[in-house]
From Swiss-Prot:
Record's protein name: Large ribosomal subunit protein uL18c
CDD domains, sorted: Ribosomal_L18_L5e (cd00432)
Record note on quaternary structure: Component of the chloroplast large ribosomal subunit (LSU). Mature 70S chloroplast ribosomes of higher plants consist of a small (30S) and a large (50S) subunit. The 30S small subunit contains 1 molecule of ribosomal RNA (16S rRNA) and 24 different proteins. The 50S large subunit contains 3 rRNA molecules (23S, 5S and 4.5S rRNA) and 33 different proteins.
UniProt key word Transit peptide: yes
First and last residues of the transit peptide: 1-44
SUPFAM superfamilies: Translational machinery components
Keywords tagged on the record: Chloroplast, Plastid, Ribonucleoprotein, Ribosomal protein, RNA-binding, rRNA-binding, Transit peptide
Originating species: Spinacia oleracea
HAMAP family reported in the protein's UniProt record: Ribosomal_uL18_B
Pfam families: Ribosomal_L18p
Molecular functions per Gene Ontology: 5S rRNA binding; structural constituent of ribosome
Family label: Belongs to the universal ribosomal protein uL18 family.
Gene: RPL18
Amino acid sequence: MAAATSLSFFHSTLASSSSSSVQQLSLPPKFVNFRPQTLPLIQAKAHTRREDRTARHVRIRKKVEGTPERPRLCVFRSNKHLYVQVIDDTKMHTLAAASTMQKAISENIDYSAGPTVEVAQKIGEMIAKSCLEKGITKVAFDRGGYPYHGRVKALADAAREHGLVF
């Protein structure tokens, strides 16, 4: 046997008189020069919270569409303000809007660290009143990729309490 095609293994048996013996094992020729392939290294992509939110919003927008009979109520949160729009996607028009930048809210509520749940409730109340004045009773809620929790939930609940149907 050639040295390249044989492997040596150390084999000890309790029954044998010598403490160790070497056995030869031959391999088929296809395994002689075998090297495992190096697989490509797959790294996880680092996404920011904003990128994840926009991806969720894109998925939501594929399912939620505003029509003239049932426009889309869209929520946007920033660190300092909260914005809500009622949008007719067929005409690409904003039918009603409310935000913390409007004087009716910014004068009545004093907040320094951004909008709170109470502020979100006031905005939900304002957008519901604005929609009802314009004859809009049914809307499709678009949470904008944000979790339905906290300010987004408070806004939606306040809008429902004041007459909007989701």
